[in-house]
Amino acid sequence: MVRKALKIRGIVQGVGFRPFVYRLARDLGLTGYVRNTSEGVEAEIEGPARKINTFLKRLVREKPAASRIDRVTLKILRPSA
């Protein structure tokens, strides 16, 4: 199991980005949370490394058309389970 914290900056609020992140994680069977912050969107995801890598690739490739990702900061966390 792998757990990562993400900070996503760019045009990621008011464009359906947070619900997109939630659905993507749910569809891949990942757990965690996603929320808006004053600087963008923050999320934590946890699951098998392969699925987290898929999540990160799809996050950029399938993002909402009106969104723009300028920067993603990743931090590895200790798995909760």
Q: What are these regions, as identified by a protein language model?
A:
Residues 1-81:
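Intrinsically disordered, low-complexity, mixed-charge
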